């Protein structure tokens, strides 16, 4: 790590000196929903350390839409163009130049720029190109340095990782729990779609971006049957690309459940989960969103992802781990590298689920325990 002498110990370790006279702060984090939820405590720490500064998120188009007129630690969003290792273009998104973006961003005259987007091989050059007085963040072995940096080590809880990163600039942790409050507009949109609840609601989210994180649809259907039998109204949520797996859960459940595919915007989904007695989900953005809005959760994790992403709290949450360490198809050991193998890495091209060993009974027992209070 390279940084000035620390001011003193914080709740998670040393806290560096604050940067003087900071009016504008850039924060690079341009990936998906769950990834963003993980940095909310870091953003709250930055807000507490620099209460008068404007915090600008360098993010994706969905960030700009979500944070428009929404209270929280983000004042403004600058949309970063698609770039290798940063983000892929949205469907139909017009081409844009990273060089033009950086030129426009430099006109903001940032005092402080924070890299909270992975190890920095692709993101540190962008942060360095903003022209801020001070840059800080994470650095993997193949990444260029920033003014203040902390070594990026893959297996670390994401919330703690980014809290340690912002501590480099004097932003001590104020919480380790991501929190997000649905707005009145969010709640009204959710009510318009879902109507009033006649029974307590639970939500199941059977999708996940990576197929290796998906618990089988028939297992979710078994959970739906159990909870519907206990008297709960069961919602099955999904994005439009998850229509097939939602349909599989609904068809296999054998009891009335309510599919919600693409009917709820992100804010309305947050409000929906906030009003649920429980959310059961694969390791996914919606799982982390549910936890952030205060819903009790049962999360199904591959063990490597559990290290990085599962909440450490158990009062309202039950992460359940799959201990699979070898590809279920070819048997390749997936522990030497990072999660578990990227597509095409090494000798294993397979995308089969790594969480099929999680039993239905364990998920149902965890759900019932949380629902019992």
What are the residue ranges of the model-derived segments?
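Catalytic machinery of carbohydrate-active enzymes
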Residues: 1-373
